[in-house]
Swiss-Prot record:
Binding site for Mg(2+) 1: 375, 379
Name of this protein: (-)-beta-phellandrene synthase 2, chloroplastic
The family this protein is said to belong to: Belongs to the terpene synthase family. Tpsd subfamily.
One protein family per Pfam: Terpene_synth_C
Record's keyword terms, sorted: Chloroplast, Lyase, Magnesium, Metal-binding, Plastid, Transit peptide
Catalytic activity reported: (2E)-geranyl diphosphate = (-)-beta-phellandrene + diphosphate
Organism this protein belongs to: Pinus contorta
Gene3D superfamilies: Farnesyl Diphosphate Synthase (1.10.600.10), Terpene synthase, N-terminal domain (1.50.10.130)
Top-rank taxon, per record: Eukaryota
Length: 624
């Protein structure tokens, strides 16, 4: 048995804490705290086992999750060492960046350039795609824009607009590889391109067709068609057809071609696609299979590896800082909750790979960890009386109320209070205004959403699917994991623009619904075993009598598939006031959580996939 004793905050100097951040617009009385019972203060520590229900010395019955806890050796994290911050590596990276910029700039933007007019369009697209997939595109934003502006001139021309493009501006015929790569890349960068260009690659029966010889060139063309099809918007039938055709073609090709860098790339993309494909994991894969036949290709790969390892040095320091924070607030002693701070840091560093985005990575990891701890408290461990006290304490936002909480909640409350305040100050440096009141309102809405679910569990009530989804998309905590991190990104977000990306704006609402639905399809059995009957699966079955679990999951997955297309549109639609960097960060948060749910629940217990992600993107540098 493990003893829960969270006392590191009891000795904290409360005189240092005041409540200057009280919401002036809200005057609330919180009787649960005013009438805080003395017996709560004197409650003994709680002994927890791995069974479904336990009791402590005063007879309180509790449910606990059957989790295996911290999967990572703290001594290993503390001892992580790297030499990639040495000046020689930084200097080499700078040299390689300049060499690649020279390559970009040597293309020019005029028709009289040195690059062959028979390949100039594809070469530009290939260069942009390569630096993005290798994770080094932040160095070449101006060069990328110039290259894509050039390609778009021809993609949108009267001749090519309906047919697609050839490999070069003077190509006599259209090319599937160039057109698919162009459609994907231009769309992701906000250029108005239509998927109708793919109609030109169908036969007279309206079916996509290829030669059947399956040359490497043809396979790569279909691979880029597959990649493009994943960036579909609602109602794009040709993109649906392209996804079906390319998936079948590539699976068939894998059975015929020899094991090679191409086959490895195909296997990876078929497995992770786009919506479950963490950028840093793809970068590691791509640098391992990237061709190195020319000096230029060798420089691209070398820069990618050097940058990967320089960032690895920064990850080491940030992860050690996060672990100190985790220990300071007594989280290791909370044996009823999941200890997955390392995993959450990994997720953050997989989607925010610019070294300057340290505040984003750490804030994301901490907010995600809070959501996990509170989920375990509200759904499993806490009593109704304790949950009401904690809910009231969050609304009060005052460190003095910690005395009214049971022992195991004290450290959690102070961690939330301190960290949210700290991140609000960090955001103020970027936003030029205090965002704490806004963030507190988000926390109130979030914490309130837990109480109906706790009552459902207590009473055995099973809501309708819509009733469940309306509440659970808030309690899932997506808004909490997104809001404060994006406020630190360096982009000013005035209140009216922030509301276009924050809940309940459609963009944020879609992310919340997608993750709630996908998460439930992976977790509902384990949740049910802990006494949590309500899930999107069980509620959908309630609304549709006679439906099997398998059928319900199939329909929910179909919902997610369609919602992802809506999310694509919300991300890439024109005339949006929200900076694309902020939308992309929120979108990538959806991708990384979706990655964790791809095959099973990657959060209840670290799966092979999650462990692999931590090792390949955080713990292990790339061999040079």
């Amino acid at each position: 048995m493990a003893l829960v004793s969270v006392a590191p905050l009891v000795s904290m100097r409360r005189s240092l804490f005041s409540s200057p951040y009280e919401l002036k617009s809200i005057d609330k009385t919180i009787p649960n705290l005013v009438m805080c019972r003395k017996r709560m203060l004197g409650r003994p520590s709680i002994r927890v086992s791995s069974t479904a229900s336990v009791s402590n010395d005063d007879g309180v019955r509790r449910r606990v999750g059957d989790y295996r806890y911290n999967h990572w050796d703290e001594d290993l994290i503390d001892s992580l060492a790297t030499s990639y911050e040495a000046p020689s590596y930084l200097k080499r990276a700078d040299t390689l960046v300049e060499a690649i910029k020279d390559r970009f700039n040597s293309m020019g933007v005029d028709d009289g350039e040195r690059m062959s007019p028979l390949t100039d369009l594809y070469q530009r697209l290939w260069m942009v795609d390569s630096v993005e997939r290798l994770g080094i595109d932040r160095h070449f934003q101006n060069e990328i824009k110039s290259a894509l502006d050039y390609v778009f001139r021809y993609f949108a021309s009267s001749y090519w607009k309906e047919k697609g493009i050839g490999r070069g501006r003077q190509s006599a015929v259209t090319d599937l590889n160039s057109t698919a790569l162009g459609l994907r890349t231009l769309r992701l960068h906000g250029y108005p391109v239509s998927s109708d260009v793919l109609e030109n690659f169908k036969d007279h029966n309206g079916q996509f067709t290829c030669s059947g010889i399956q040359t490497e060139g043809e396979i790569r063309g279909v691979l880029n068609l597959f990649r493009a099809s994943l960036i579909a918007f609602p109602g794009e039938k040709v993109m649906e057809e392209a996804e079906i055709f390319s998936t079948m073609y590539l699976k068939h090709a894998l059975q015929k071609i020899a094991v090679s860098s191409l086959s490895q790339e195909i296997e990876y993309l078929l497995e992770y696609g786009w919506h479950t494909n963490p950028p840093r994991l793809e970068a590691r894969m791509y640098m391992e299979v990237f061709p190195q036949d020319t000096i230029y290709e060798q420089k691209l790969v070398e820069l990618a590896k050097v940058e990967f390892n320089i960032f690895h040095s920064l990850q080491k320091r940030e992860l050690q800082s996060l672990t100190r924070w985790w220990k300071h607030y007594g989280f290791p002693q909370l044996s009823f909750t999941r200890h997955i701070h390392v995993e959450y840091y990994t997720f953050g560093s997989c989607i925010a790979t610019d070294p300057k985005q340290s505040a984003f990575r750490l804030c994301f990891a901490k907010m995600s960890y809070f959501v996990t701890v509170l989920d375990d408290i509200y759904d499993t461990y806490g009593t109704m009386e304790e949950l009401e006290l904690f809910t009231a304490a969050i609304k009060r936002w005052d460190p003095s109320v910690v005395d009214c909480l049971p022992e195991y909640m004290k450290g959690v409350y102070m961690a939330v209070y301190d960290t949210v305040n700290e991140m609000a100050k960090e955001a103020e440096k970027v936003q030029g205004r205090d965002t704490l009141n806004y963030v507190r309102q988000a926390w109130e809405l979030y914490i309130d959403a837990y109480m109906p679910e706790a009552k459902w569990i207590s009473s055995g009530y099973l809501p309708t699917f819509q009733e469940y989804l309306d509440n659970s998309k808030i309690s899932f905590g997506t808004r909490i994991t997104i809001l404060q991190p994006i406020l630190t990104l360096g982009e000013p977000l005035p209140h009216e623009i922030l509301q276009e990306i924050d809940f309940p704006a459609k963009f944020n609402d879609l992310i919340s619904v997608i993750l709630r639905l996908k998460g439930d399809t992976r977790c509902y059995k384990a949740d049910r075993a802990r006494g949590e009957e309500a899930s999107s699966v069980s509620c959908y079955m309630k609304d549709n009598a006679g439906l099997t679990e398998e059928d319900a999951i199939h329909r929910i997955n179909a919902m997610v598939h369609n919602l992802l297309k809506e999310l694509n549109w919300e991300l890439l639609k024109p005339d949006c006031n929200v900076p694309i960097s902020c939308k992309k960060a929120a979108f990538d948060i959806c991708r990384i959580f979706h990655h964790g749910y791809k095959y099973r629940d990657g959060y209840g217990d670290a799966t092979i996939e999650t462990k692999n992600l931590v090792k390949r993107t955080v713990l292990e540098p790339v061999p040079l």
